């Protein structure tokens, strides 16, 4: 398990591998509180599929796997497995609630193309 914290950039002068926004962390915390299970963590992953080749996935998980990278933010944990990590380096994981609806969104600088809905991409 690789642990990443908000203070990693200031203590090691290394950039964080991805950004987990306050809005996303706060929404995850709200959803975990609604579930009543404080052991839940948000797992973000990449899998084959979608109209552009890869698609993002979000799920809650109680387990931290040996190859997971863990980011702690505002009292919640974000998990990314080692295969997905390579596609998410530099990405911003955010939560938006606007006229288009409420959803988690990923801004990924590694994506060369994305589909219209933003849920799939290619590299």
Curated annotation (Swiss-Prot):
Cofactor comment: Binds 1 iron-sulfur cluster per subunit.
Record GO terms (molecular function): 2 iron, 2 sulfur cluster binding; 4 iron, 4 sulfur cluster binding; iron ion binding
Cofactor: iron-sulfur cluster
Keywords (A to Z) from UniProt: Iron, Iron-sulfur, Metal-binding
Binding site for iron-sulfur cluster: 51, 115, 117
Classification via SUPFAM superfamilies: HesB-like domain (SSF89360)
Keyword Ion transport: no
InterPro entries for the chain: FeS_biogenesis (IPR000361), FeS_cluster_insertion (IPR016092), FeS_cluster_insertion_CS (IPR017870), FeS_cluster_insertion_RrpA (IPR023063), HesB-like_dom_sf (IPR035903)
Subunit structure, interactors included: Homodimer.
UniProt-recorded name of the protein: Putative iron-sulfur cluster insertion protein ErpA
Organism the protein comes from: Burkholderia cenocepacia (strain HI2424)
Gene: erpA
């Amino acid at each position: 398990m690789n642990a990443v914290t908000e203070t990693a950039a200031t203590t090691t002068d290394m950039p964080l591998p991805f950004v987990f926004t306050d809005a996303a962390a706060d929404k995850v915390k709200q959803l975990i509180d609604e579930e009543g299970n404080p052991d839940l963590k948000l797992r973000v992953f990449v899998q084959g599929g979608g109209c552009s080749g890869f698609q993002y996935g979000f799920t809650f998980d109680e387990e931290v796997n040996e190859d997971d990278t863990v980011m702690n933010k505002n009292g919640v944990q974000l998990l990314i497995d080692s295969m997905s990590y390579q596609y998410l380096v530099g990405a911003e994981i955010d939560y938006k609630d606007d006229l288009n609806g409420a959803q988690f969104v990923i801004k990924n600088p590694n994506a060369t193309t994305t589909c219209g809905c933003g849920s799939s991409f290619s590299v």
